[in-house]
Design a protein with these regions (language model features):
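Helix-to-loop junction immediately C-terminal to a conserved catalytic motif
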Residues: 48
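Short helical segment in ABC ATPase nucleotide-binding domains corresponding to the A-loop/adjacent helical element
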Residues: 92-101, 111, 115, 204
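Conserved ABC ATPase "signature" region
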Residues: 108-127
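Conserved ABC ATPase "signature" C-loop
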Residues: 211-212
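ABC ATPase "signature
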Residues: 217-218, 226, 313
Length: 334
């Protein structure tokens, strides 16, 4: 879907981006990760030509973006920034309708799209369409920013640290909301971040930047389990093995209670009818599960599906054994 080929950007004698190449498949979320000033945002802005490359090429769906009209290109790509960038003198509805209006959409069609998108980003259209940005919280503004980026149904979205200015509690919730939206709309997303946990949580693939170059490109698990250099290992952190727990979910290691020597009682619908020390959801990542087990002082948890039906038990020993086994395998491969 997106192919970056030998991309460079120089400002006189200063090289901001040097010979960057990678590919992102349709429907993937690719996080451009790295410290400040490493070329992440410059690379992102060369994709929609807010910054013109010194050399190299960007292809979207097989088309060389240098051969496209820059304004038309930008209108065909969703763009979300940390500062949100909503027009303060325009209502939420008018903000969302900016690109559809520029593309000549019928006014009624644009308004229907605005209402539809607010519902997608979990904002009640009857309450928020006529509000102004100053009447919204930071998290609500960010959701409207995402809705605006989706307004013309672009195949590609570029996001420059979109959640960086939001407090940690709301940021985690909005990340979850964005992932839910992405499962629904299936866009190809390039996402700038310096937050390792955010990259691990959200990315299908990660481009780790260092001083204008890509140090390593791969899945979050690749970077955590098999860092390609000392820089990659240091950047991913000394706790990178624990970070891998975010990539695994409770359901994946839930085992039969009887086989684990644990007695539980179920009702006729398969729901728990007895007390258990801890309940976790099938989709909870293993870092959440392990943290909850330690907080509760228990070595196991009951794993439940979205309908509260019992799936099995998650043993703390299985979490640790699974992680250790994967780590040993990763070391042997390297």
């Amino acid at each position: 879907m997106i192919r970056i080929q030998n991309l460079c950007k120089r400002y006189g004698a200063v090289t901001a981006v040097e010979d960057v190449s990678f590919e992102v498949q349709e429907g993937q979320v690719c996080v451009l990760l790295g410290p400040s000033g490493c070329g992440k945002t410059t690379t992102l802005k060369m994709i929609n030509r807010l910054i013109e490359p010194t050399s190299g090429k960007v292809f979207i769906a097989g088309r060389d973006t240098a051969e496209l009209d820059s304004v038309t290109l930008r209108r065909s790509i969703g763009y979300v920034i940390q500062q949100v960038g909503l027009f303060p003198n325009m209502t939420v509805e008018d903000n969302i309708c900016v690109v559809p209006n520029l593309l000549g959409w019928d006014k009624a069609q644009s308004r229907r799209r605005a209402a539809e998108l607010l519902e997608i980003v979990a904002l009640d259209s009857s309450l928020f369409l006529k509000r102004y940005p100053r009447e919204l919280s930071g998290g609500q503004q960010q959701r409207v920013g995402v809705a605006r980026a989706l307004a013309a149904d672009p195949p590609v979205m570029l996001m420059d640290e979109p959640f960086g200015a939001i407090d940690p509690i709301n940021r985690d919730a909005i990340q979850d909301e964005f992932m839910r939206i992405q499962r629904q709309v299936n866009k190809t997303v390039l996402f700038v971040s310096h937050d390792i946990d955010e990259a691990v949580k959200m990315a299908d693939c990660v481009a780790l930047f260092r001083a204008g170059n890509i140090e390593q490109f791969g899945s979050p698990d690749d970077l955590l389990a098999r860092p390609a250099s000392d820089f990659a290992a240091d950047f991913m952190g000394s706790d990178r093995i624990l970070k891998r727990l975010r990539l695994m979910h409770a359901e994946s290691i839930a085992r039969d209670a009887g086989a684990a020597g644990i007695a539980v009682e179920l009702d006729r619908d398969g729901r728990l009818a007895s007390q258990v020390p801890l309940r976790v959801r099938a989709a909870d990542d293993l870092r959440q599960v392990l943290s909850a087990q330690l907080a509760k002082g228990t070595s196991w948890a009951a794993c439940l599906d979205k309908d509260q039906r019992f799936l099995g038990v998650v043993l703390q020993s299985d979490i640790l054994a699974n992680l250790t086994q994967d780590t040993v395998a990763a070391r042997q491969e390297s």
